[in-house]
Amino acid sequence: MSEIELVFRSNMDEHMNKIKEKYPDIKFYSYSKLGNFNQCKRGYYYTYIDKKVQKPSVYTELGTAAHTTLEDLYDGKVDKLDKALFDNEFKKCELFGIDFPKSKYDIKGGYYKDISAFYNIYNHIEAKEGDKFISELGFILILNEKSALMGYIDLLILHNDNSCEIVDFKTSADFDKKKVVEAARQLILYSLAMEQLYGLKVNTVSWEMLKYVSVQVGNYKRKEGIRGREWVEKCSTQIKALMKKKNYDPGLIDMYVALAINNNSIDGLPDDIKSEIKVNTYRRFFDITEEAKKEFYEYTLSSIENINKMLNKREEEWICEVDNFFCINLCGFYPKHCNPILNLSNKI
C-alpha cells in the first residue's frame, strides 16, 4: 500500500478527475446521498438539486465534535481524548437554539450523559507492532462506467501484511435488526472500496458505538452495549458480588456502590476492585456475507437508477413521505421550505 497514493480530502478531486478521463459519463454518489433520497425525496431535491440552505442539526454539530476529537487522538495530535471541543459545541447549540427533538423524555440530558461517559472511559484501540492508524481515508468505488461511490472512512487500522480493520464511529442509538441491515451497507461499501482501490484484505469491520459501553467485572459474564449514562448501575449487582467475594463489609459495599451509581463512575471504589473492572466503548462487529454484498449492490444500483428517473421531475413530484416527527424535529428544511403538517412547500 505504501506504493499507492492515498486519497484524502485534499486530493479527492484529483482522483475523481482521473476517473472522469477514463469514464467521461461517470457520476459520483455518496452513501449519505443515497440514504437521503430513500428517506425523503423532497429533502434530496432541496439538498442536491435546489440547494436550499438547511438549518443546523444538533446531532450533526455534536457528532462532528466527537469525531474530530477521535481523529486528533488517532492522528497522534493528543495523547487522550479532550472533551473541551464537545462541551464548547454543546454550549453553542444551547446558545443558538439548535435544539434536540421535543419529547417527554430528557433526550438532551441523556445524550450528554452518554457522551460524557464515552469521554471518561475511552481507551485507544490497541495496536500491534507496525500497525498504522489512518483517519478519514478517502475512497472511490467504481460500480460501472456511469456510477461510482465516494467517501471517507473514520478509521482504518493497517497491518504490516497489507490487511486491515475498518472502524466507523457512531454517536447514534444502537441498531435493531432492521436498522443493522441499513447501517451495514456503509461498512460493506468501505470494505469493497479498500479491496478495489488499495488491494487490501479486510479482516474485520465494526462500529464503535460511542454512547454505549462493554464491561467485564471480574470473572462474571461480560455485559455488552450498555448505555453510557447508566453503566455502573447496570453492573452494580456484579460489583457487589465481587466486593462480597473479597470479604468487604456489607455496609461498606452498599455505601461504595451507591456512590459509584450516583457518579456513574468507579473512581471512588477501592483499588483492588477497580483493577478487576474493565470498561470500554462498545465495539460492534459485523460479518460481511455474500448475501449482504448482494443486497448492498441491489440497493445501491436501484437507488441510483431511481434518482436518475426523478431528475427531470418538478419540485412537487419529489414527495415528502417521512413521518411528522422526523420532519418537525430532524429535517433541516422544516418549516421554512417544507411543512408536512400543512402539506405545502414554500417557494422561497
Regions found by a protein language model. Name each.
Residues 1-348:
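RecB-family 4Fe-4S metal-dependent nuclease core
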